[in-house]
Amino acid sequence: MLLASGVNFGFRLTVPHMLGISSGFLVMAFAVGLGLAEVFSRLPWIYGVLKWAGAIYMLYLAWCIANSAPPDDVLPVGQPAARPAMPLGFWGAAAFQWVNPKAWVMAISGFSTYVPATSGLMIVAGAAVLFAAINLPCVSVWALCGARLRNVLRMRRNLILFNYGMAVLLVISLYPLLRAY
């Protein structure tokens, strides 16, 4: 998603998306550290609901990526611009972490691997901040690569094909998640 956002909107307009991912993950990781993972182990159907809600939202995002209009600077002269798409903003990206199954897996596995279950509030908070601090440069690389690809994808046809490809890959990424159901 960040690669596609970097291509379609550039690095600067993708920054709120990146910050939203890291902030949303910080809050979610903190909640996991405080015991939310225990809720999932006792009520596994909640994780299933989140998994399916996340999958539906990811399908919607794939549709948005596939149908996003190329930026005006890619359109041929004289062709009217389509209604411009907007990148996912801070709050949307932060909220998406709560239905993003991959983020849940990272938060739960991070805490279960690196943080003792009997840790106090300060250790849990410190671990959540550390996980989010590691997350930000990692997601930034995807957006930066997308911004660099933007120069290569100047032709409208290439950008449209790229967006379709990213949408298909996003849909394919759901297979490992949903094959258990």
Kindly label every feature range from the protein language model.
Residues 1-48, 106-132, 143-144:
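Juxtamembrane transmembrane-helix termini in multi-pass membrane transport proteins
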Residues 67-85:
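Flexible cytoplasmic inter-helical loops of multi-pass small-molecule transporters
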Residues 10, 100-101, 155-156:
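Short loop-to-helix capping motifs
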Residues 29-33, 99-108, 168-181:
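Hydrophobic alpha-helical transmembrane segments in multi-pass integral membrane proteins
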Residues 42-73, 135-142, 152-181:
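Selective transmembrane alpha-helices of multi-pass membrane proteins
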Residues 21, 89, 93-97, 131-135:
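Residue-level signature of transmembrane alpha-helical cores of multipass secondary-active transporters
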Residues 12, 83-95, 122-126:
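Alpha-helical membrane-protein architecture signal
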